[in-house]
Amino acid sequence: MTRTTRRGHRFRRPAGAAALLLVGALALAGCGRDASSREPAAAGDTTGVTDTSIKVGATFPLTGVAAPGYSTIPKGAQAYFDYVNDNGGVYGRKIDYIVKDDAYNPTTTSSVTNELVLKDQVFAMLGALGTPTHEAVVDFLNSSKVPDIAVSSGSVTWGDDPKEHPWTFGWQTDYESEGKIIGKWIADNMPKARVGLFLQNDDFGASGEKGLRDYIDKQIVAVSKYTPGGTDVTPQIAALQAKKADLVVGFNVPSYTALSQLVAMKLNYKPQWFYTNVGSDPTLVGSLLANFSKGQVKNGAQLLDGVMSTAYLPDVSNTSNPWIQTFDKIWKSNGSGGALTNYELYGMSQAYMFVQALQATGKDLTREALVKTLEEKGGDFTGPVFAPYRYSADSHLGTSGMKVVKIEGGQVKDVTGVETTDIGDADITESSESESTPPADGIPPAE
């Protein structure tokens, strides 16, 4: 696969966020690191690691506008870690998973990340969620040399330039590559569509738009953007309707899928919708529609029938998939109750990859060794993801592709096979690799 890295198109954290991090660091500097828990520097940094435990941190919106769905991701990771711990841990070490609420607010993300690094002294961060939120802390984590693994966001910032962020790794398919795959499908299957874009006003939306324009630039007739936190998207949807967009592509979080659908209903606007995997879970969006409409919308999941989307993981409704079967068993034995959802599946999948990296690193675990493992071996890691990881010394981007899917009767149906690509001018090709199957016990083997 040809790969072109991108330079000069970065979405940098504003100086104000850097100042907040500095203030937080100074405030907590007195906590220091416990020298007794670390080996000499020459042996590598073992902060957060003892003979019996590995301390791992994460930030998620457990409250606030982005909490629906996203707040359950760490429950999936916790269930998987509990299962691994119950089976002896990783080289005898149990994983101590510490999750803090940032309410999808970058200022709060800065504060709680400082706590995790300087007070809790975590070994690594895993799955910290959000593009605007993680942009506020990525420089701090890298300057502190804390492994920042599997960021829960498809921003290219997490992996397109390892020299700038050597300690950070993406996980899911990046938004630019997703935009390319969506754009190519539209160009091939709906070449006469008048395309409107509904975008989150940050790197999430901007990267998606860049990928789309590689294939359907001339088809795009309108672009509407929203700022996270607001609840009225009437002007944005009305603008798309005014331009007679008959296909709307949304790079947005689930709450705004529901809000855009409610506004479209009020305006009697009925385009074909194509939401990214981020905002297309029918069960969650259906519940949000009922909530936001104060019960006026019933069976909201049915409103998404016919909606196009993408997928880089199997859907929980696919009960014949061996990964779904394995994770469902683990969820039933170690989860926090209720049926397994796609969000808990996401967290379990990240936790599986992290355990895979720990196993591949070996018993002598250091921060430096973990990063080296991901760069040298991560490209060969397998798991529930459909496409290979792109991990190497030159790229810290996550999985390399996805399927185009369609929602029918609350189920996710494949429209294409696995399409793989990369950022920049890399071509889109159909993957020839077969999907992997999980180990019998659901735990990656030690090397």
What are these regions (language model features)?
Residues S333-E344, V355-D414:
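Segments of small-molecule ligand-sensing domains
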Residues R38-A58, G89-K94, A187-A193, D364:
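Immediate post-signal peptide segment of exported/extracytoplasmic ligand-binding proteins
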Residues T107-S111, S155-T157, E164-N268, N318:
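Extracellular/periplasmic Venus flytrap/periplasmic-binding protein
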Residues M1-K55, E430-E447:
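Short, low-complexity disordered leader/linker segments with a strong preference
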Residues P40-Q78, K100-T107, L129-G130, F198-A206, ...:
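Extracytoplasmic "Venus flytrap"
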Residues P40-G44, P68-K75, N87-D161, W171, ...:
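Beta-alpha junction/loop-to-helix N-cap segments that form part of ligand/metal-binding clefts
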Residues A264-M348, A440-D441:
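Extracellular/periplasmic periplasmic-binding protein-like sensory domains
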Residues L116-L129, P147-V151, V195-L199, K244-P254, ...:
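Periplasmic-binding protein-like
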